[in-house]
Amino acid sequence: KRTKEEKKNPMAEVDTSTIDINQIPFYYGSHYSNPTYVSHFLTRLFPFASISIEIHGDKFDDPNRMFYSMQKTFETASSLKDDVRELIPEFYTIPEMFKNINNLNLAQDKLDTEGQAIIIDDVQLPPWSKNKPINFVVELRKNLEKNQKINKWVDLIFG
């Protein structure tokens, strides 16, 4: 796991002895957004539910890997070196992505270690949102719009 300091300075842990001086430096060894990440976040909505099922061999992904909690997603992205997912634009525009409006059986009747049914339904949102997706989306958008350093992120990602 990475410390908060290492997350702030990802190049701090790069082994410089293996760097090719002719190679342009980069932060991400894999892409931060791809169809699998998008369907991961949007799996409660069609056509992304169908795409997710197709990606995972005619079933939804394992419940332990599904997007079910903003807190868990934040913890994973903040601590795992190889988790480079970014929030997709829909986080700022589509509150329905956090609700299981299609009543999908996302856990596919799987059982936990105690034999209890695993239930994955709506995404667990932070307490400040009062578990209302519209509150969550509006607050994310407000924070994005007031961020004075968004241009640095754009430069980092797109050059």
Q: Which residues does each predicted region cover?
A:
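Long, non-catalytic protein-protein interaction scaffolds
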Residues: K1-G159
